[in-house]
């Protein structure tokens, strides 16, 4: 796996799924391929994105700044600085300085990532802030190692909370989760369908599913009534894809 592929993988792992994630993935690919070099426009776009947490925006801003060639005097952005200040905790700042000294001695991506993984996400973000504010310099490879370690720490905690939700025995939460997943699957089907004639059937299935979810929410139903709803939808989607000759593993 190339270095930039690895960076893209880690960064996208902390972005919530949805149309915005696809948009960010495209921006990252363009930046890494050297197709998008307008850092100012990129940062303006990032700043106004909804849904993303300030820390995720800060990390993305840091990655864009590392990758885009920019004029020496280009202003640092306040929204990135605020996100990478370790919540203003002096403890985080002390640890960030210690980590920075260790990173100065590293020259490889994996070496830097290994060193950084023993620190908390707050200290890692503060260390990124030091580098972003030009208070310290490390090689781009080492900075990317720091980015990936931070994303891994965040993704780990997100995974724990996601697993808690998936394994919850509370029938109401499970029911709502199935309906939300059915809705998002239906939305994805509608987006994929496009304007081809064969798409009418997929649109119909998706539309029915969304109406069913709406009705269930409006009248209130037994928590087990949504079981199988998403699976039925996915079966329909995969059957439609086969006829269209499309194979999208991502939905499985």
Swiss-Prot record:
Any GO BP: viral budding from plasma membrane
InterPro entries assigned: Flu_matrix_M1, Flu_matrix_M1_C, Flu_matrix_M1_N, Flu_matrix_M1_N_sub1, Flu_matrix_M1_N_sub2, INFV_M1
GO molecular function, one term: RNA binding
Domain of life: Viruses
Principal cellular location given in the protein's record: virion
Membrane topology listed for this record: Peripheral membrane protein
Region ranges (RNP-binding): 165-252
Spans traversing the lipid bilayer: none
UniProt name for this protein: Matrix protein 1
Source organism (scientific name): Influenza A virus (strain A/Swine/Wisconsin/1/1961 H1N1)
